[in-house]
Amino acid sequence: MGIGIPDVHEAWTWYRKNLNMDVPVFEEAATAALMLPYTGGKPHDRHAILAMNMQGGGGFEIWQYTSRTPVAASFEPKLGDLGINICKIKSPNIKAAFADFDKTYLLSKDIETTPNGLKHFFVKDPYGNIFQIIESDEWFTDRGDTTGGVYGAILGVSDIEKSLAFYTTVLGYDEVIWQGEGQFSDLNSLKSGKSNFKRAILTHSKARKGGFSPLLGKTQIELVQNLDEKGQNIYEGRYWGDLGFIHLCFDVIGMKSLQEECEAAGHPFTVDSANSFDMGEAAGHFSYIEDPDGTLIEFVETHKIPILKKIGWYLDLTKRDALKPLPRWMLKSMGLNRKKD
C-alpha cells in the first residue's frame, strides 16, 4: 500500500509503534521521473521507505514529496468516494489488538463483524488515513504482535458491476466471498457509513505464487458503492504522492505478458519503467494501470532485494525460478533488518 505522507520518518515511527511495520526493505531519496502523467508533467523529488511486518501480509510504501509540499484533499473523504478508502491490516488476535490500540486513534467503539463473519475495527492515523484491523488465521511467523501486514483494501467505486469485472478478471480476485446491498452496522463509525451501499468482498481462489508468496499471503479487495451520495474522486485536482493512499501495489511475475493482458482488457499501462528501476537497496520493473474509476494500481516485478543489509547480502531474483517461493529461513532473515525503537 502506497501512502502519501507529510513527514516520512515521523510516519514510519507511528506505523512501527502502532502497526509493527518495522522491517525496512528499502529507504531512498530520489527523483520520481517516470510518474509524469500523475505529477503535473514534471519530475519531483521524494523520500520513500518500504516497510514490512514479518508476521505476514503486504507492506507500506511510505512516500513523501521533498521538492513540493504534499497537498491534502480539499474535502474530508467519505465512505464510497472514488479511490482507496481504507487499508486492511490483518490481526491474529482481534480482541487483543482492540484492547491494546491507542484509544486516541480508534474510530470503532467496539469490535464489529463483517457480512461474511470476520471480526474487525477501524482506526485513523495522525494523517487522516483509515485502517481496518481484521482477523486472519493465515500467518508467516508469530512474533507475538497483535497486528500483521496489509490484507487488502476497501475501494470506493461508481459502478460496482464494472469494478467487479475489472478486479475479478484483470487482477484475479475471482472469488466473490460476499456481495449484497443495504445499510451495514459495521460501517457506522465511518463518515457516511450509515448510507446505503452496494458492497462486495473478493479474494483469489488460487494460491499465490512467487518468491514472497509465503510472506505476503492471501489478500482481499472490498468494493463499496455509495447509493445515497455521489462519490468524489479522492485525488481530484491533486498529484499522485499527495496525502492519502496513493496506490495499491502487487508483486507480479512476467510483466510483458501482464501488459498484453491489461491492454486486451482495455486497461493499458499508463506508466512503465520499461526495464529496470533501481531504488538503491532494491531493484525491479514497475508499471501502473488505472481501475475503472482511475484508482492507481502498481505492478512490481522484483529483480533485487536486500536480505541482510548489515553484511551486504542482496538476492538477485532474476537468476532463480520466479514462481518458486523463497526458502522460509531466507525470508525470515529479512527480519534481522528490523528497526527497534
What would you call each of these model-derived segments?
Residues 61-65, 117-143:
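Short, structured interface segments
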Residues 59, 132-133, 296-299:
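Short glycine-/small-residue motifs
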Residues 4-57, 113, 156-218, 280, ...:
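Core segments of cupin and vicinal oxygen chelate
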Residues 1-12, 22-28, 82-89, 135-164, ...:
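N-terminal beta-strand motif that seeds the catalytic metal site of vicinal oxygen chelate
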Residues 1-7, 44-67, 71-100, 119-124, ...:
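Vicinal oxygen chelate
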Residues 103-108, 174, 265-270:
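A common structural junction motif
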Residues 13-18, 99-104, 168-169, 260-265:
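Short amphipathic alpha-helices in soluble, non-transmembrane regions
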Residues 8, 203, 208-209, 215-226, ...:
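C-terminal functional regions that serve as terminal interaction/effector modules
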